[in-house]
Amino acid sequence: DTQCCGKSTCAREGSTCCCTNCRCLKSECLPGCKKLCCADAEKGKCGNAGCKCGAACKCSAGSCAAGCKKGCCGD
């Protein structure tokens, strides 16, 4: 399973981590990867344009940047 930021099985950890199907909770993300975690998406911005958000996604419908709409809950 290489889907979660901050996990020992993540393909790329740290500042370069970019998870395709992030399912991590905000508390599970590494400090350097936090801004790229779906659970950390808020205030109309998605941390990762390619993410597919899990249950912890805080994005509301229509709030995400155009490049992240496919990955945002509600859009």
Curated annotation (Swiss-Prot):
Propeptide: 42-75
GO molecular function: metal ion binding
Superkingdom field: Eukaryota
GO CC terms: cytoplasm
Pfam families named among the record's database cross-references: Metallothio_6
Tissue: Posterior alimentary canal.
Name recorded for this polypeptide: Cadmium-metallothionein
Native organism: Eisenia fetida
Taxonomic lineage from the root: Eukaryota, Metazoa, Spiralia, Lophotrochozoa, Annelida
